[in-house]
Amino acid sequence: MSMVETAPSKIQVRDLNFYYGKFHALKNINLDIAKNQVTAFIGPSGCGKSTLLRTFNKMYSLYPEQRAEGEILLDGDNILTNTQDIALLRAKVGMVFQKPTPFPMSIYDNIAFGVRLFEKLSRADMDERVQWALTKAALWNETKDKLHQSGYSLSGGQQQRLCIARGIAIRPEVLLLDEPCSALDPISTGRIEELITELKQDYTVVIVTHNMQQAARCSDHTAFMYLGELIEFSNTDDLFTKPAKKQTEDYITGRYG
């Protein structure tokens, strides 16, 4: 099962294959990512879920030995073409990584940095954008009195929310989250999960997670991957309660992986 038709598609993946040199990492992937919903990728380490996520904003483009074949359609436009403007793509498709990665600058400038690359705002408008992004990331009340302190002064959970605020400050259409809670404590993880659920009101969210309970709590749709192949993709509740494939059932019940 590769299509989820409960909402319009934001991203359509068609016959996608990906290679690290000669290693065939993704094999004939076909799936649709629903607009303004949360889609989770699960599977054992090395199954290709992070590789798939990173094709959505061509993170591999700096490495000539890595290549993608097939189509990834963002609102109907194939982003895998050589004519795709990478900077414009990454303005539309933001990304938050596994480990919090604040820039070595103030909290304010962490948010403003990306905005300045794409927009020329007055100071008042930039102040408003910074407040908006931090509010969206549930971080404004904790940082409003120390905006000019270093981003490194924040706790790990706060730093990850800062990275989310930085990602949405340029107003992308899609937000990619690669294991965003793996380095966080349970309380910080809970806050990030609440935030993910809220973000889908404005963004299409795709999350990679090793935590199946997290996928069950946060996502509307879940894809199970194994050895570079998409094994099953369906409504999250259905995948976890009545999986269609034995491989999926074995994985979610802990029989392998």
Curated annotation (Swiss-Prot):
Catalytic activity: phosphate(out) + ATP + H2O = ADP + 2 phosphate(in) + H(+)
Subcellular localization(s) per the UniProt record: Cell inner membrane
Keyword Transcription regulation: no
Gene Ontology molecular function: ATP binding; ATP hydrolysis activity; ATPase-coupled phosphate ion transmembrane transporter activity
Keyword Lipoprotein assigned: no
Signal peptide interval: none
Predominant location category: membrane
GO annotation, biological process: phosphate ion transmembrane transport
The EC number(s) this enzyme carries: 7.3.2.1
Domain of life: Bacteria
EC top class named in words: translocase
Keywords (A to Z) from UniProt: ATP-binding, Cell inner membrane, Cell membrane, Membrane, Nucleotide-binding, Phosphate transport, Translocase, Transport
Pfam families: ABC_tran
Bilayer disposition of the protein: Peripheral membrane protein
Binding annotation for ATP: G43, P44, S45, G46, C47, G48, K49, S50
PANTHER family: ABC TRANSPORTER I FAMILY MEMBER 17, PHOSPHATE IMPORT ATP-BINDING PROTEIN PSTB
Subunit structure, interactors included: The complex is composed of two ATP-binding proteins (PstB), two transmembrane proteins (PstC and PstA) and a solute-binding protein (PstS).
Function as written in the Swiss-Prot or TrEMBL entry: Part of the ABC transporter complex PstSACB involved in phosphate import. Responsible for energy coupling to the transport system.
Name this polypeptide is given: Phosphate import ATP-binding protein PstB
Organism of origin: Salmonella typhimurium (strain LT2 / SGSC1412 / ATCC 700720)
Underlying gene: pstB
